[in-house]
Amino acid sequence: MGRPAARDLTERELEVMHVFWSRGEATAAEARDRLAESGLDRTYTTIANLVRALTEKGFLRQLNDERPFVYRAVRSYEDVSGRLLGDLVQRVFRGSRAQLLCRLVGQHRLSAEERTILEQILEEPPR
C-alpha cells in the first residue's frame, strides 16, 4: 500500500502536524498544549483522536509502548506542503504555476521581504 495522499489531511489534522514538525517528538497532551498556546484551544480527547487518526494514516509514528505515548512525524513538512501545493496547482489552476503566481501576486501587494525572496528565486539558474 502506498503512502496516503497529503490532501487526505483534514484542516485539524494539519494543525496537529504543524506541532510535530516544529517540536520533533511530542505526546498528545504536549500537542494540545502547544496548540492552545497558539490560540487553537482543543480538548485533550480531540487531539488524542486526531493523533490516533494521523498514526493510522501513516503521517505519525508512535515511538514507545507505555503511556504517555510519544509520537513523531513520518512525513516531513517539505513533502506534505509540496504535495498539497502541487495538488492545488493541478486542481484549481489546471497545472498552471503561472496562474497560481499571478493570483498570489495579484491579490495583495508584495512586502519588501517577499519581493526580495521572489527576486532571489528568479535569479537562480533553471533546474
Question: What does each model-identified segment do?
Answer:
Residues 9, 19-27:
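Short capping segments at the starts of secondary-structure elements
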Residues 10, 65-83:
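Short, cationic-aromatic polyanion-contact patches
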Residues 48-52:
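Short, hydrophobic-biased segments on the C-terminal half of alpha helices
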Residues 26-35:
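Short acidic, hydrophobic short linear motifs in intrinsically disordered regions
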Residues 14-18:
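Pre-recognition alpha-helix immediately N-terminal to the DNA-recognition helix
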Residues 58:
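Glycine-centered, phosphate/nucleic-acid-interacting loop/turn motifs that mediate DNA/RNA or nucleotide
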Residues 80-127:
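Amphipathic alpha-helical dimerization/coiled-coil segments
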Residues 62:
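Short beta-strand "wing" residues that participate in macromolecule-binding interfaces
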